[in-house]
A protein has these predicted regions:
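Double-stranded beta-helix
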Residues: 131-154, 183-225, 313-323
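Ligand-binding loop in jelly-roll beta-barrel domains
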Residues: 80-82, 90-95, 114, 124-127, ...
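Short, structured patches in soluble enzyme cores that scaffold and shape functional sites
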Residues: 100-102, 122-125, 134-136, 147, ...
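His/acidic/aromatic-lined binding-pocket segments of jelly-roll/cupin-type domains
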Residues: 87-88, 96, 117-120, 158-159, ...
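Transition-metal
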Residues: 1-138, 198-231, 253
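Acidic/His-leaning functional-site neighborhoods
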Residues: 230-296, 304
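Short beta-strand/loop turn elements enriched in aromatics
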Residues: 121-143, 242-246, 258-270
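Short acidic-glycine-tyrosine-enriched beta hairpin
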Residues: 156-168, 182, 286-304
């Protein structure tokens, strides 16, 4: 019954957002609104993805989880209450707040949810940077002093980035996205975020945005000093070149490149998600067929087994698998 699935994006207005999702990926953004997030695959109270293709186009991801969890996720994974991942594209016209997601132990104490995630830089303005972790030697006491004097930026580890760079962000890692970046974000299905510093600016309502200083301080890993970008090395293969990005108990992400005209196959007993970065890709399984353009995602249910892909142009894509 299931087949390769695409979904309608859900757009989120953010004060730091822009219009790059329209420019780069022809997303149908609402007019004159700063859109910071496109939720591409989501099963949350704040937004559930509606299926966009095929015979199930009147259903959504929540319906799939309630009625076809085993086919979707794979045997042994069907008892998951919610879909395990949240997939977004972020457009940061301006720098985001300095924030942290709580580790599982802290999340339980505070009533939130842990969130581990990874960023893949899809587009970057000259001089763009991300803030990840702390400078070496920064202590909690020193960090709190900088908070009081609004000089937190002096504590943050800055990393210059360009398109193609990637960063892993386990729960507890302090971070902020700099302005001028478009990012494909793969994350644990959670939306608990504690803002600790917001660059002394105001929100869409003209008032300073709420900060969550105490929960943030309890969540930050103060031993997390100067983390590095993920390796940019691809394997050498005449058909499918692979770059191993993340191999975590929550999810695995690989970056893949395929030359124009190559036909290849993917097989897994767990669900997979394909996110196209460049080119044009055709995905087929039995009679079902999906064509992806950059900025689109396709969910491959676990029950499909082998799926055929055709690179209609030179393609680059992310392959996401649940563990």
């Amino acid at each position: 019954m299931l087949y390769p699935l695409t979904f309608q994006p859900i757009f989120k207005e953010r004060i730091w957002g822009g219009r790059n999702l329209e420019r780069l990926y022809a997303k149908p953004l609402p007019a004159e609104v700063p859109i910071g997030e496109s939720w591409e695959i989501t099963d949350r109270p704040e937004g559930v993805s509606a299926i966009a293709n095929g015979s199930l186009a009147d259903k959504d991801l929540r319906w799939l989880m309630e009625n076809h969890a085993q086919d979707l996720l794979g045997t042994g994974r069907e008892n998951t209450e919610r879909f395990p991942l949240l997939v977004k594209i972020l457009d940061a016209r301006a720098t985001l707040s300095v924030q942290v997601h709580p580790p599982s132990t802290v999340a339980r104490q505070l009533g939130g949810e842990p969130k581990t995630e990874m960023w893949f830089i899809a587009d970057a303005a000259p001089g763009a940077e991300i803030f990840v972790g702390l400078k070496r030697g920064v202590t909690r006491a020193g960090f709190e002093r900088h908070l009081k004097s609004s000089t937190v930026a002096e504590c943050l580890h800055r990393v210059p980035v360009q398109a193609g760079d990637a960063m892993f962000l386990p729960s507890g890692r302090l971070h902020a996205i700099g302005g001028g970046l478009v990012i494909f974000e793969i994350q644990q299905n959670s939306d608990t975020t504690y803002r600790v510093f917001d660059w002394n600016r105001v929100g869409l309502d003209g008032k300073p945005r709420d900060l969550h200083v105490e929960p943030a301080l309890a969540s930050i890993n103060f031993d997390d000093a100067e983390p590095r970008l993920i390796s940019s090395i691809y394997s050498r293969n005449p058909v499918l070149s692979v770059r191993y990005l993340v191999d975590d108990p929550l999810f695995r992400v690989d970056g893949c490149k395929v030359k124009r005209g190559q036909r290849f196959h993917l097989r897994s007993d767990a669900l997979q998600i394909i996110g196209l970065l460049k080119g044009r890709l055709k995905i087929s399984h039995e009679a079902a067929e999906v064509e992806l353009t950059p900025g689109q995602f396709c969910l491959l249910p676990a029950c499909l087994g082998r799926v055929t892909l055709l690179a209609e142009m030179h393609i680059e894509f992310l392959q996401v698998q649940t563990s």
